[in-house]
Structures are given as C-alpha cells and as structure tokens.
Amino acid sequence: MDKCKHVGRLRLAQDHSILNPQKWHCVDCNTTESVWACLSCSHVACGRYIEEHALRHFQDSKHPLALEVNELYVFCYLCDDYVLNDNTTGDLKLLRSTLSAIKSQNYDCTTRSGRTLRSMVTADDSFISHEGAQAFLQNEDRAFTALWHRRHALLGKVFRSWFALTPKGKQRLEEERLREVAEQKREEARKRRQQLKRKLKEEMESTPPRKSSRLKQQMQPSPKTELPSVQKMNQKYTPTTKQKPPAPTSIEVCLKKIGNSPIKRKPTVTPGVTGLRNLGNTCYMNSILQILSHLHVFRECFLQLDLNQTQELLAAAGSGKTRLSSKYPPSAVLPKVTQKHTKVQRSLARRQSFSSGLSGGASNSRNMELIQPKEPSSKHISLCHELHTLFQVMWSGKWALVSPFAMLHSVWRLIPAFRGYAQQDAQEFLCELLDKVQQELETTGTRYPTLIPASQRKLIKQVLNIVNNIFHGQLLSQVTCLACDHKSNTIEPFWDLSLEFPERYHFNGKETASQRPCLLTEMLAKFTETEALEGKIYACDQCNTKRRKFSSKPVVLTEAQKQLMVCRLPQVLRLHLKRFRWSGRNHREKIGVHVRFDQMLNMEPYCCRESTAALRADCFIYDLSSVVMHHGKGFGSGHYTAFCYNPEGGNG
C-alpha cells in the first residue's frame, strides 16, 4: 500500500539486533529462510510460509511492522499489506541502506545527512573483526558445549540407572559383579605371590654364606620341589587381616554405583558432530565445510598438512630472510594415492584414533579454544591452514558448536565474490574454494623449493594430487553423423555432473504427474540419453574428406545426434541437481519436487562400455556420503543444511 499510518509512529532503536548479521535467523527454529525482523523490538523470526513465528510474535506483542532481512521490504500486519512509504525521519530508507552496506561490506555510501555509513561500524570488516563480538560468540560456544556435556551426562546416568532395573540389565549387572569378584580374587592371589617372593628373598639374603659349594647346591631348590614349597609357604603366609569385604549384592548400591561411574562411558560429543555457527547468511559455507570434513581422504590430508609455518618461511625468504628455522616440525607423509578409481567405502572412513577431550584420550594438538574462533593474526592468510585448524576442532571431540570466524575472514580476503553477508550459492562456493586451495598448494610447492623441507614438499605434492583428483572424472562426448554413421569422440574432464529434471517437471501446471517424486537414476538417464541436434548443423569429417581444406566448395553440413557418457569415474562423485525452470520470459522459479535416491548408486549403466570394460562390477558402486539441501522456494533467499555420514557415531 502507498501509505501506512503505522509507519509514522515508528521509532527505530539505534542498537537494533538486525544490525548484527549473526542475528539474521529465526530465534525459534534457527532458519535463515524468509526471516523477518520486528521494527518495534529486537525480535527476529520466520515468515508465515515457514513456521509463522513472526506472525505469532505480532499476535502476542501487537507490533505491526516487520522487515524482511534479505529482500528488505516492509510488511504491516494490521494493514495486511506491504508498505511503500516511510516515516518523516526516513528511518526505513536508512535501515535499508545500512543493511545493504553490511551485506556487501561497502560502507562508502552516504546517508541523507551526508554522513558515511562507516561510522556505524567499528572496523573495516564490521562484526567479523570486532573482538567484542568474537569473544561474545566464543563464550556462547563454550556455554553451549558445556550445556551439551551436562545434558548428555545426566541423560546417560538416567538411562544407565533405568537399564539396571530391567531383566537384561540385572543380568548384565550380575555378570559384571561376578567379573569384579573374579578380578578381585586374581588381584589378591597376585599380591600373595608377590608377598611370598619378597619373604623368600629376605630369607635367602639373611642366610649366612657357605664355604662349601656342595652345601650351596643343596640350598638351591630343584625345579621339581619348588612348586610344593611355594604352595606350603602360600598356605603359611596367607594374610588374614587385610581381606576385602565381599562385593555388595544390594540392587540399590549397584544402581548408585552404575549411575555415578564414568568407566567405559562414550564421549559426549562424537568427533565430527560439531555444529558451525551461522555468522550471518553463512550457511552455504558451513554446509560445504561439513561435507568436506566428512570425506575421509580429504580430511586426513589437511589434518596432517599445515601451511602456516611454510608460508611464513616463504614470506621471510621473499623479504630477504632466508635462514631456515631449526624448529620447523617435520610432517608426516601420506601414503601414495593411485589414480585408479576406488569407491568411497565406509570401512575406509574408519579413521585412526584422533579422539581427545571428553573421551579421556590425550591430545597432541594445540589448545582448541584458541584455534578457530579467532580470525587469523598472520598477515599471510592460508585457506589450507584454516581447513587444518577447523578440522582439528571439529574432530577433537571437545566442541559441540564453534564459530568459524577465521575461515570466513580468509574467504572474504581470498575470494572477494563471497565478501559480505549476502546469501550465496553453495555449489559456486565449493568450486571457488577448491580452486583457491589448489592454487595455494601449487604456489607454495613451487616457490623457493630449497627452503622447504623434503618431507613437507612431498606432503604438499601428495595433498595437491588428492585435491586435483578426488573429484576429477572424464566424460565421453560422442557425436554421430546421421548421414554416414561416423562417430566422433571427445574426452572432456568434469568435477561434478549437473543433472536436469525430466521434461514433465518443467511445466508450470499442477499436474499430478509433475508432482510425483523424481528418481535420481531417472535424472542420470536423462543426462546420458541421446540428444538430436536441431537441423543440419554438424560438419562431419567423414562426409568432408573429399573436400579440400582451402576449397571454395561449401562445407557439407548434416544432421547428427550427441550423447554424453562417463568414461572415467572419480573417487568421489558430486551430483548437482539443477532445480530451476523458466516461467515466462525472464523469470526463473525453483522446482520443489522431491528427489528419491538410494544409499548405494550403481553407475555402470551410465558409463562407456569400451572405457570401463576392464573394471570390476564393484568399482561402479558408490556409497552415499553427504547431501547438501537447499530450503526455500526461490533463488534469492533460502537456507542450506548438510547431512553427512559420520563413521565415529555410525549415523549422520
């Protein structure tokens, strides 16, 4: 509506929570899709097409005006319409300008009074470099992790006490009691044997020396008579005053013992099950980091490789300081990775012991409290180093939640396209991140190779080989001339397969056929199906063999058909679903149809038989590792979540 009378009464607070990107999520369900901020208080909630938490806030508080955080339009609940006007002080215009500046991290625009928006923030990077905000969220991470520990500890204590009351629990309790009694008896027998040996030794030392060797031999007991003498002495010197009382048999005492005992208790935080805090529309980054950390080969590479000290060494060499530090830590060398395709098995993901913290294991890593939450202090920013430290935190078994400030800061500096708090595409971020990591490894390995230890150079080379080949596959593009049946083959590399939906899902009508779930195998079949090229547009080499290269005769164009097939499978297969269709001339909308897929995928029907004939049947089987899901109806806004298989916990 053109004029809303409720806008004139608006008095916007200067310290509104909407100015903090970390608050751009629903306080009730934590979604970042369709987030509305109340303009009368600091409440932020989701819209009516999600869980209606913003509408419920209006019904409870009677605050009529709310602003959509991403699209920046204002809605009045009392007028039940969108608001186009502003108040006399122009607060809505200023608020929109401020939010746009925060998203793009560009504070050079001016307000109506001529002041720049830079004065509204404390540093160039706004909240990402604000030490107070970082410290506040770091304390929240600690509090959340402590609460997680306490809840799981209390829950485990309750379930252990409850299990002891069941018939199976009583049976197990009795078995444990018998084992403890048997262990107690074995311990007492061991102590008696030690006491007997000590007394025999004291008697032998107190015996006066003999001059005759014959008498010395007589004093030495023979092996045949040693066992009876030990048995007699065992009976003679059995202690009777230090016997322990029998184990308690009362069920109440045993229940108390089980409830309070921390023995054999599993770690409260499963390694890898560490949440990444949304720092302001950063769900695209968090979801990608989660799936990369759950790829066993990729994770182990960056857990062993840390380029921070290497880059500092190269920087010192570039400035003239070429002296090699003797304190440089040697790096472990990864096993050589072959180019042969191997499926991603769960048995491969049974990583070596890296547990520490809650599980009671010792940790040789650095202090986890200071690794990731703070932004990098070094002038030489390294994405490999940030992946190294972040994976250490996520797989330490200590943290239930961590704020990846340093990772976001590095992404902003090294990938400017993702700078700011605007919503981004997760697929594009994954491609850019892998590209930057690859460039960093190549640059580090080739600059001043004599200054880098041989073990570190070898490790960098192997990690670069894994990063380049873990997602790398090859496609066979085959064009068949319909005039002479000649086939032209071209090998093309790929790092992911972009799959389109079948034609029935590209119509705007609400037919029942288009609403049925789509199968992933159906989308793969469409990707590899034969496609007829429109018209006579193909210049066949076979049909033009008799024509000279510089002849004046026109090139013979024929009809043809094209087909894509996989000729080399990657170690990790990435499938990208193209969920958009054109509605009208220039409008795109999302295809919200559910896609069904199994836990295992057989890629043999979609491969070129000539290229993959030598492979075994199990080489075509892939196990599901991770899924990144986009929630939302449009492309301009939404929320990303990641579902990953965790080998430590046995589930996602």
Curated annotation (Swiss-Prot):
User: Which residues of the sequence carry a binding annotation for Zn(2+) 3?
Assistant: C38, C41, H57, H63
Pfam families linked: UCH, zf-UBP
- EC top class named in words: hydrolase
- Cellular component GO terms, alphabetically? nucleus
Lineage, top-rank taxon, reads Eukaryota
Q: Which GO terms describe its biological process?
A: cell division; negative regulation of ubiquitin protein ligase activity; protein deubiquitination; proteolysis
Spell out the PROSITE patterns in the cross-references: USP_1, USP_2, USP_3, ZF_UBP
Spell out the reaction equation it catalyses.
Answer: Thiol-dependent hydrolysis of ester, thioester, amide, peptide and isopeptide bonds formed by the C-terminal Gly of ubiquitin (a 76-residue protein attached to proteins as an intracellular targeting signal)
Q: Which UniProt keywords apply?
A: Cell cycle, Cell division, Hydrolase, Metal-binding, Mitosis, Nucleus, Protease, Thiol protease, Ubl conjugation pathway, Zinc, Zinc-finger
- Tell me where in or outside the cell this protein is found: Nucleus
Task: Kindly identify the residues recorded as the active site.
Answer: C283 (nucleophile), H639 (proton acceptor)
Q: Where are the zinc fingers (UBP-type)?
A: 2-99
Residues reported in the UniProt entry to bind Zn(2+) 2: C26, C29, C46, H53
Region (Disordered) residue spans:
184-230
Which residues take part in binding Zn(2+) 1?
C4, H6, C76, C79
Enzyme Commission number(s) of this protein = 3.4.19.12
UniProt GO molecular function: cysteine-type deubiquitinase activity; zinc ion binding
The segment(s) forming the USP domain are 274-652
Q: Tell me its family.
A: Belongs to the peptidase C19 family. USP44 subfamily.
PANTHER family from the entry? Answer: UBIQUITIN CARBOXYL-TERMINAL HYDROLASE, UBIQUITIN CARBOXYL-TERMINAL HYDROLASE 44
Per its database record, what is this protein's job? Deubiquitinase that plays a key role in the spindle checkpoint by preventing premature anaphase onset. Acts by specifically mediating deubiquitination of cdc20, a negative regulator of the anaphase promoting complex/cyclosome (APC/C).
Q: What is this protein called?
A: Ubiquitin carboxyl-terminal hydrolase 44
